[in-house]
Structure formats: C-alpha cells, structure tokens
From Swiss-Prot:
A GO-annotated cellular component: cytoplasm
Protein's recorded name: Trp operon repressor homolog
Disulfide bond positions: none
Domain of life per record: Bacteria
Lineage, highest ranks first: Bacteria, Pseudomonadati, Pseudomonadota, Gammaproteobacteria, Pasteurellales
Amino acid sequence: MYISRNMEQWNEFLDLMRKAFEQGKEQELLTLLLTADERDAVALRVQIVSQLLDKSLAQREIQQILNTSAATITRGSNMIKIMPPEFMDWVKQQLNHNNKNELGSD
C-alpha cells in the first residue's frame, strides 16, 4: 500500500500529530498545516467513509447527499478495500460511537 513518497517526512508528521493530540493542540496544528479547503476535504472523506461503511445507501445517493463527485466517492471506496479489515472494523466502531454521541447531545 502506498503511503508517502517520503516516509521520513510522513513519520515526522505523524510524530508531530501524536504530540499535538497528547497536549491538546490538535486543532491549532491542523489549522496551521491545512487550508480551510483541505480541512473540508478531510471532513468530507470522513463522511464518505462513514456512509460507505454504513452500507445503507448506494454510492450515487451518498454522492448526492454529500454534494460531491463520483470520483471522490470512488476514491474513498477504493481505500476501504485496501485497508486491513480489522482496522476498518475499528474505524466503523469509532464512527458509530461518534454518531451515537452526537445524537445523544441534542
């Protein structure tokens, strides 16, 4: 699986992210590193993955609901296919947990 052209830089980024989360500075760091459009793209990918893992809607419906392109949905779907199933189970649990928390906060 392709991760990065420069693994040393990628690992430095991951280390910085870990430190930011440990110290409660993840919001500031991601705001510094990502443009508003990039942050929106990451948030959209989370929504796409969540919808795809839920399996209650067709990809075309997800595309329409999230107002995005078929190619964007396909990229999310393709990544799900190449990730280890155990990891995807974990992601699904996290997304389901987050959705339950959001529903309970109304």
